[in-house]
From Swiss-Prot:
Region (Flexible loop): 98-108
Species this chain originates from: Porphyromonas gingivalis (strain ATCC 33277 / DSM 20709 / CIP 103683 / JCM 12257 / NCTC 11834 / 2561)
Pathway the protein acts in: Amino-acid biosynthesis; S-adenosyl-L-methionine biosynthesis; S-adenosyl-L-methionine from L-methionine: step 1/1
Principal cellular location given in the protein's record: cytoplasm
Chain sites annotated for binding Mg(2+): 16
Keywords assigned by UniProt, alphabetized: ATP-binding, Cytoplasm, Magnesium, Metal-binding, Nucleotide-binding, One-carbon metabolism, Potassium, Transferase
Gene name of the encoded protein: metK
Residues annotated for K(+) binding in this entry: 42
Binding-site residues for ATP, renumbered to this chain: 14, 165-167, 252-253, 261, 267-268, 284, 288
Protein name as it appears in the record: S-adenosylmethionine synthase
Reaction equations catalysed: L-methionine + ATP + H2O = S-adenosyl-L-methionine + phosphate + diphosphate
Length: 429
């Protein structure tokens, strides 16, 4: 029997994502000049104000206020009428040193035996229903908002009224084998200028209706066609005439961003991962250096699941890894192929083979995925997974105020670089 499944996403201008991006930009600044930095940075944003807090152990000096302002400006909060803008917002920092009790459990004279930064369980997931091995619901939700932000930033934007804050939600019908067969519902809520105002002959309700009609029309005729072009024909065909499209269902969305809602780092953990299709251990990612296995082990688990599915071991795979604080080796690795395995092994036997192929000690993960580089700001909006790996030039400022250019490799955990090893281990052609 068919079923409906729903995932959501939020834009880079959503207050929680503003916080995530600031936290990760500060992390990157520390890692750029001291790769061994230990960082846990939390951010709160609200009307006209940013609050930074957390713990750091580093040889670097970072101008956290200027870093935060740069991120806010890049997102698009540049006008005082937004109630939150890069140049005028107040920034308060309460970042202090890392606990020595935590640090003693992580640092080792033999770096390969570096302990996990905390206890916990982390999950990785992959499915072959899309080319990037992500659930289509969350992948589409991300693409809708990424493309909407692209439209907003275009010099001659066809939607010039757009503001940075936005949310999306996608409901897809799946057949009884879990394959997407039809897009049922798309919801887009986007912040906008008050480009039609009440005046003589136009009531406030009529002005609101006119704005909503214009935005709905533009979403349907500008945004949706552009997003369809991003997908191969069989996915684009799921956009049929029966799709229900809700645009700004409340009727008006002028007050938004941190002025409309307070934002906090780490509050969009399902958006950041698999849109609810897979389990989540509860730990957020942004603002954390890779000694925190909440982040590094979740990336490693995704890397495993994606390569295993790409190698043909299963059509779908969930990987759980768990740690004890201060201990290098994981306490457990669990696999669930949801009955969609293509090898004559139990899920437990598959997990044993994973242990042979992948070293899941924290330091080994850091080295394999190059996680001690300043690569995190780009992850903090539109999902940490399903992204294309690429090299980027990034500029950082050292403690002397000198700009440094770095070439870094982003989204290394999305590489399909273990497929051949997996095929050899499992006897797959």
């Amino acid at each position: 029997m068919s079923y409906l499944f729903t995932s959501e996403s939020v834009s880079e201008g959503h207050p929680d994502k503003v916080s995530d991006q600031i936290s990760d930009a500060i992390l990157d600044q520390f890692l750029a000049t001291d790769p061994d930095s230990k960082v846990a940075c939390e951010t709160l944003v609200t009307t006209g104000q940013v609050v930074l807090a957390g713990e750091v152990k580093s040889r670097s000096y970072v101008d956290v206020q200027e870093t935060a302002r740069r991120v806010i400006e890049k997102i698009g909060y540049t006008k005082s009428e937004y109630g939150f803008d890069a140049r005028s917002c107040g920034i308060f920092s309460s970042i202090h040193g890392q606990s020595a009790d935590i640090n003693r459990g992580v640092d080792r004279s033999d770096r390969s035996e570096q302990g996990a930064g905390d206890q916990g369980m982390m999950f990785g997931y992959a499915t072959n229903e899309t080319e990037n091995y992500m659930p289509l619901t969350v992948d589409l939700a991300h693409h809708l908002l990424y493309e909407l932000a692209t439209i907003r930033k275009e010099p001659s934007s066809p939607m010039p009224y757009l503001r940075p804050d936005a949310k999306s939600q996608v409901t897809i019908e799946h057949d009884d084998e879990g394959r997407p067969v039809r897009i049922d519902t798309i919801v887009i809520s986007t912040q906008h200028d008050e480009f039609v105002q009440a005046s003589d002959g136009i009531s406030e309700a009529e002005a609101d209706r006119m704005m909503q009609e214009r935005i709905h029309h533009d979403i349907a005729t500008i945004l949706i066609p552009r997003v369809k072009m991003l997908y191969k024909p069989e996915i684009a065909a799921l956009f049929d005439e029966k799709v229900r499209l809700f645009v700004n269902p409340t009727g008006k969305f002028v007050i938004g961003g941190p002025h409309g809602d307070t934002g906090l780092t780490g509050r969009k953990i399902i958006v950041d991962t698999y849109g609810g299709r897979a389990s989540h251990g509860g730990g957020a990612f942004s603002g954390k250096d890779p000694s925190k296995v909440d982040r590094s082990a979740a990336y490693a688990a995704r890397h495993i699941a994606k390569n295993m599915v790409a190698a043909g071991v299963a059509d779908e795979m969930l990987v759980q890894v768990a740690y004890a604080i201060g201990v290098a080796e994981p306490v457990s690795i669990y696999v669930n192929t949801k009955g969609r395995s293509h090898v004559a092994l139990s899920d437990g036997q598959i997990a044993e083979k994973i242990k042979k192929i992948f070293d899941m000690r924290p330091y080994a993960i850091e080295q394999r995925l190059k996680l001690r580089n300043p690569i995190y700001e780009e992850t903090a909006a539109y999902g940490h997974f399903g992204r294309e790996p690429y090299e980027a030039y990034k500029t950082f400022v050292d403690e002397h105020g000198t700009e440094q250019m770095r070439i870094v490799e982003l989204f290394t955990w999305e590489k399909l670089d273990y497929v051949n090893k997996i095929k050899a281990e499992f006897g797959l052609s």
